[in-house]
Amino acid sequence: MHMSLEVLEQLESKVQSAVDNISLLKMELDELKEQNSKLQDENHLLRNEHVAWQERLRALLGKMEQMGESI
């Protein structure tokens, strides 16, 4: 009887350790999801900014070509 109680206590300890570990991993996962969401938002903004810069550069090059043609 004593042996089975000891085994039960060990099992209980291992289960509690696993539960604690799972809780920590869930918190870490939530943090990573939040960080990923922020990075996706930042990436979206940077892509839009890049497109805007490309459009402005094309417009400037177009004006320079027009000036070159009119000379």
Curated annotation (Swiss-Prot):
Keywords: Cell cycle, Cell division, Coiled coil, Cytoplasm, Septation. Pfam families: ZapB. InterPro entries: Cell_div_ZapB (IPR009252). GO terms for cellular component: cytoplasm. The keyword Phosphoprotein does not apply. Residues 5-67 form a coiled coil. GO terms for biological process: division septum assembly; FtsZ-dependent cytokinesis. It is found in: Cytoplasm. Homodimer. The ends of the coiled-coil dimer bind to each other, forming polymers. Interacts with FtsZ. HAMAP family: ZapB. Non-essential, abundant cell division factor that is required for proper Z-ring formation. It is recruited early to the divisome by direct interaction with FtsZ, stimulating Z-ring assembly and thereby promoting cell division earlier in the cell cycle. Its recruitment to the Z-ring requires functional FtsA or ZipA. Belongs to the ZapB family. This is Cell division protein ZapB. The gene is zapB.
